[in-house]
């Protein structure tokens, strides 16, 4: 899947709040079941995003999987969701496990996530310090479409 060729991404409009609630929520539940503490800072989101739901889920699943491999379970995972200036941002930060042991990694997962986000018109930024790892996803956001007959 990784390479120069484009992925077969099919963008569709989604209510960002509903999609994030479901997809991010699934990852949070999985991590909590593994003993992680999640600290959420979720601002009210009222926008529409264009994503390929299956590929977006793949990005979020990869992040949750990486956290379960590399994050220190004794420290909280921070999840921030914000909507500002025409963009939706999801930021996930964790403390790095000091001795992860024998964990296979070729970092292809993160590169694929970056490619998926770029093809969906967004960004995937990762930052690592000595003890923290942070990923920030951004997607262009549009106002929610008002259904016919609805008033704001």
Region spans (language model):
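Conserved micro-motifs of the catalytic ATP-binding
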Residues: 4-9, 48-51
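Conserved catalytic submotifs in the C-terminal HATPase_c
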Residues: 10-12, 32, 37-47, 95
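A conserved beta-strand-to-alpha-helix junction within the catalytic ATP-binding
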Residues: 10-25
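Short helix-loop "hinge" at the ATP-lid/N-box region of the Bergerat-fold HATPase_c
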Residues: 66-68
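Short beta-strand/loop element within the Bergerat-fold HATPase_c
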Residues: 74-86
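Glycine-rich/acidic phosphate-handling loop/turn and adjacent ATP-lid/helix
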Residues: 90-108
